[in-house]
Amino acid sequence: MLVGIGTDIVQIPRIEKILHLYPQLFAKKILTLKELKQFALLDKTNRATFVAKHFAAKEAVSKAFGVGIGQGINFKDITILNDDLGKPIAEVSSNYTKKYSFLNIHLSLSDDYPVCVAFAVVEGGYNVIPV
């Protein structure tokens, strides 16, 4: 069953400015521990695009759940990783997903300076709550 779709677009220069002012603070606000480990390995020229893509991906996934960031799901509830072939994978905190019997999250990311875009489709089944 389709839970929802979501999309987001981010201006990479906007993220560059924020990272210049708050290099670690902003990254720590947006990224999970797994993502921060990847972020730390990047050279400074790739960090803004990395954060912009993760920001857009998390916004798109949250919108696909029908809530948006800050409306029941937060940046730290969603982790964006890549499989061995580079395909983006979204992991969502079990605190948020426990109402679903299963979830499939499909995520597509693209960037072409000065923008990056994310598109997410969430499929799932709801747990039936006995009355």
From Swiss-Prot:
Residues that hold Mg(2+) according to the record: 8, 59
Keyword vocabulary terms for this entry: Cytoplasm, Fatty acid biosynthesis, Fatty acid metabolism, Lipid biosynthesis, Lipid metabolism, Magnesium, Metal-binding, Transferase
Catalytic reaction list: apo-[ACP] + CoA = holo-[ACP] + adenosine 3',5'-bisphosphate + H(+)
Cross-referenced Pfam families: ACPS
Top-tier EC class: transferase
Enzyme Commission number(s) of this protein: 2.7.8.7
GO molecular function per UniProt: holo-[acyl-carrier-protein] synthase activity; magnesium ion binding
A biological-process GO annotation: fatty acid biosynthetic process
Domain of life from the UniProt record: Bacteria
Cofactor names: Mg(2+)
Cell location: Cytoplasm
Family matches, as InterPro entries: 4-PPantetheinyl_Trfase_dom, 4-PPantetheinyl_Trfase_dom_sf, ACPS, Ppantetheine-prot_Trfase_dom
GO CC annotations on file: cytoplasm
Protein purpose: Transfers the 4'-phosphopantetheine moiety from coenzyme A to a Ser of acyl-carrier-protein.
Family under the similarity heading: Belongs to the P-Pant transferase superfamily. AcpS family.
Protein name: Holo-[acyl-carrier-protein] synthase
Organism: Rickettsia canadensis (strain McKiel)
Highest classification ranks of the organism: Bacteria, Pseudomonadati, Pseudomonadota, Alphaproteobacteria, Rickettsiales
Gene that specifies this protein: acpS
